[in-house]
Amino acid sequence: MLTSLGVKQGHHALDFGCGEGRYTVPLSQVVGKEGCVYSVERNEEAILAAKERLSLFSDPDVVRLLKSDDIEAAGLIPKKSIDAIFAFDVLQYIPDSDKLFLYFRSLLKPNGMVCIYPAAIPHPGDVDIKLIITKMKKIGLQYVKSTEYKMMHSADMVDDIVHSFKRIAG
């Protein structure tokens, strides 16, 4: 799935809301030693689980696990340095998606991708993908496609949709 979404060896990726690192591990394997994966999470228990999983399956020089509370203010991820951002099953927990999307755009290289998986399983605070497409377009992130994949959701595999956006000029 990750390569079909455009991730390549040597890329720099952001796994925003990485949880226990279920997508961070395969991302790190795709980008390889020449690449980098920033994994961002705010939940301490999930961070500990991600550290354990990453120690078993990922090169520690490839993955940078960051706590999300102060990431933008600290400037931990360089602007215009990211090829692909993944926000999988996390947007329902974000109170200000406008601010988050602007931050994502600031991190993306030209033609960089944002991939969103809103999760079909009901959560508090549903995600309106039509509204997201409108918001992304307003800030210069062009809708590319919606593709169905087998997605990891907690301990389950579900058929669901990933929506892709590309940074356009500016």
Where on the chain are the PLM-derived regions?
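A short SAM/SAH-binding and catalytic strip from SAM-dependent methyltransferases
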Residues: D83-D96
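Conserved SAM-binding loop
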Residues: A50-K51
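Conserved alpha-helix/loop element of class I SAM-dependent methyltransferases that forms part
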Residues: M1-H11
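Conserved beta-strand signature within the Rossmann-like core of class I S-adenosyl-L-methionine
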Residues: N111-A119
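Conserved SAM/SAH-binding beta-strand->alpha-helix loop
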Residues: N43
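A short acidic, Gly/Pro-enriched loop at the edge of an enzyme's catalytic core
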Residues: G75-I85
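A short glycine-rich, Lys/Arg-flanked "PGG" loop and its adjoining helix->strand segment in the class I
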Residues: D98-P110
